[in-house]
Amino acid sequence: FLPILASLAAKLGPKLFCLVTKKC
């Protein structure tokens, strides 16, 4: 479960960071 969650976080993290901080 955790490895899957970690991989999802690695994929979605940059996109969420981009949306939240407006630094794309």
Swiss-Prot record:
Record organism: Rana boylii
Organism lineage string: Eukaryota, Metazoa, Chordata, Craniata, Vertebrata
Pfam name, any one: Antimicrobial_1
Family under the similarity heading: Belongs to the frog skin active peptide (FSAP) family. Brevinin subfamily.
A Gene Ontology term for the protein's cellular component: extracellular region
Protein name: Brevinin-1BYb
Keywords (A to Z) from UniProt: Amphibian defense peptide, Antibiotic, Antimicrobial, Cytolysis, Disulfide bond, Fungicide, Hemolysis, Secreted
Subcellular location: Secreted
Tissue: Expressed by the skin glands.
GO BP terms, alphabetized: defense response to bacterium; defense response to fungus; killing of cells of another organism
Function: Antibacterial activity against Gram-positive bacterium S.aureus and Gram-negative bacterium E.coli. Has moderate antifungal activity against C.albicans and strong hemolytic activity.
TM regions (residue ranges): none
Major location category of this protein: secreted
Protein's UniProt keywords contain Disulfide bond: yes
InterPro entries in alphabetical order: Antimicrobial_frog_1
Organism domain of life: Eukaryota
Disulfide pattern: 18-24
